[in-house]
């Protein structure tokens, strides 16, 4: 569905994305995560055809990113998605359906079907009078008005209450089950972990980890073991229930604690395994210095990279209040 090769984007000499390569399969939810300035937004906007890459290729199906025909098969939901607030939800979605030349009868059917699935009430209320959660549902509905094959969602549940957040995540899973391909980015890694089939972690413009969440945790995370002894052992801390806790990093150390406890006349009452979360791995990776670059072109500092990731150079925008959206 998506093939990205050697993607590089620079702003004023500063690299926002450095030589990214990845593929996204049809019907997959593909996560793109990283700290501020990592290159996530630049990557998503390049996929959406809003930014021209400095180098590299981005192919989406049979099209290059940015091709007019490709846009007819794409739905893009940016993190900030201003709406035409004097319109109602119905009139707003029909307006965008007209932009895609969707026949009026089909546009009405799609509008009502999507609003039904999103459980959006008050469809004839002004958008400016709606809550943030309702507005986000309308923005999601807009991304679907042309029945796209590919959806690019940047922070789809940002700032929403827990109930609406869970609904948006469930709806995203439903889209993939219906055969849609979704590229999904969020700072809340629980959202990513709960919906994404595969993930790439970016740091300072580079992809530094990739795979399924279990694969990333296994390759980059560290499993720890909490050993509860019945007697004090070296490095242990007393617990409220009268046991002594020692946290170690491998089974050899677990066995060493057992031997020490038994030698002291006690034993091990319990062993608990703590698997790393995606957030644990992310925090570890985001704190590492970037790998040495082979091309010798240098590295922007983190502040410059952050500015670049939200940069303006080469960005295509629509007119009106829906800048950068379709």
What positions do the PLM features span?
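Conserved ABC transporter NBD signature motif
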Residues: 56-66, 70
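Conserved ABC ATPase "signature" region
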Residues: 94, 98, 105-122
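Conserved catalytic motifs of ABC-family nucleotide-binding domains
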Residues: 147
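Catalytic Walker B motif of ABC-type/P-loop ATPase nucleotide-binding domains
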Residues: 151-155
